Swiss-Prot record:
HAMAP family: Ribosomal_eS28. This is Small ribosomal subunit protein eS28. InterPro entries: NA-bd_OB-fold (IPR012340), Ribosomal_eS28 (IPR000289), Ribosomal_eS28_CS (IPR028626). It is linked to Diamond-Blackfan anemia 15, with mandibulofacial dysostosis: A form of Diamond-Blackfan anemia, a congenital non-regenerative hypoplastic anemia that usually presents early in infancy. Diamond-Blackfan anemia is characterized by a moderate to severe macrocytic anemia, erythroblastopenia, and an increased risk of malignancy. 30 to 40% of Diamond-Blackfan anemia patients present with short stature and congenital anomalies, the most frequent being craniofacial (Pierre-Robin syndrome and cleft palate), thumb and urogenital anomalies. The lineage of its organism: Eukaryota, Metazoa, Chordata, Craniata, Vertebrata. It comes from Homo sapiens. CDD domains: S1_S28E. SUPFAM superfamilies: Nucleic acid-binding proteins (SSF50249). GO terms for biological process: cytoplasmic translation; maturation of SSU-rRNA; ribosomal small subunit assembly; ribosomal small subunit biogenesis; ribosome biogenesis; rRNA processing; translation. It comes from the Eukaryota. The modification N-acetylmethionine is found at M1.
Length: 69
């Protein structure tokens, strides 16, 4: 692992559950708002149970999921 450009771990709160995704519906697409910068929100895919108000630990905060169709 290249430790020269390691991003800090970010905390994000789930603001809206958008729907299920994946070939068998195993992931949930959610909109998250960063705890340190509340004006910034992105869409992520989450594996496992999740609901609005949950706090996620994002190891990689720049990647955004594609929207559901």
């Amino acid at each position: 692992m290249d430790t020269s450009r390691v991003q800090p771990i970010k905390l994000a709160r789930v603001t809206k559950v958008l729907g299920r995704t994946g070939s068998q519906g195993q992931c949930t697409q959610v909109r998250v708002e960063f705890m340190d910068d509340t004006s910034r929100s992105i869409i992520r895919n989450v594996k496992g149970p999740v609901r609005e108000g949950d706090v996620l630990t994002l190891l990689e905060s720049e990647r955004e999921a594609r929207r559901l169709r």
